[in-house]
Amino acid sequence: MPVVNYTNHHNTVLAEFVASHSSPNSEIYDLCFSTFQGVLGQPGLDATENCFVLERAGVVKGVALVFREFAISRSVIEVMTDPEQSGSLDELELVQCAVARAEAEGLGVAHICVLPESGRGGLLEQVGFSQVRTYLDMLWDQDELPDLELPQGYSVRSFQSRDTPLLTRVQNDAFTGSWGFSPNTEEQIEYRTQMPNTSKSGILFLFEGDRPAGHCWTVMVPAENGVRGVIGMIGVVPEYRGKGVSRHILHAGMKYLRSTGLSEIGLEVDGNNEPAVGLYKSTGFKTMGERHWFERVLPGT
């Protein structure tokens, strides 16, 4: 059996595998390497139980991570393999090991996100998955930011060390009930603010007076031309929905990313979320591709 459970001796070689497959050039290798090591250490993952490694003759050929979201009875499985493993029996075994782990935890569904060109969707359908959502990859690369002034009484500021409870509350209030969102704990939020691909200056709050209206969480990811800034999350708390504040939150995140010297800004959005898609298109974002979410309902649910 080429699939084994993660052990601590895998840490460096596995991070090297992920970094070498994620970074198109050496400039951003270190970012990919350190970010994946951060992923392995995040609260609640327990990598020795929920990370599976595909090996051949001691060489890493793939990895699968099982993120358990007990609050919504869901597991999110992330899979990466060498290109030559695509559609192979070994890749199938890797996926099945991850699904079996989710089943053993009594979770209701397993979700896996794939790029259409990867061909992994067909493999997932062989083992009971079906496509349930399409997300759009969007990109903004214009020369000038949109000209937008904050409404009177509103202000923007970055995350500060005392803000973990505030960020946890705002994010959970903004997204609870949204497809695929599992409420976060303060421990999880604090850890993620310290990830290598995150800057606390790039986590932004929008306030009306002293009341939080929403937030934007930006991150850095590898891209063909180097590092790309990404609008990771834009959340509006329920009492501010329908007031047009999401455009100002988006603008704050874009302004921060451009201030760091990044020329490209990306984001992902649920294709079913027509208001959000419309906002991004009107701001100048263009659709560059898709990501397909597959779901398998697990036994006993």
Give short role names for the model-derived ranges.
Residues 1-16, 155-169:
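A short beta-loop-alpha structural element at the N-terminal edge
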Residues 136-155, 263, 268-274, 289-301:
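C-terminal "cap" of GNAT-fold acetyltransferases
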Residues 110-114, 231, 265-269:
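Conserved hydrophobic beta-strand within the GNAT/NAT acetyltransferase core sheet
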Residues 24, 32-36, 150-227:
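Flexible, substrate/cofactor-facing loop regions flanked by secondary structure
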Residues 87-100, 233-236, 242-259, 277-282:
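Conserved acetyl-CoA-binding loop-helix of GNAT-fold acetyltransferases
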Residues 68-71, 83-152, 294-296:
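Acyl-donor-binding surface of acyltransferase catalytic domains
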Residues 115-133, 243, 247, 271-289:
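Conserved active-site alpha-helix within GNAT-family acetyltransferase domains
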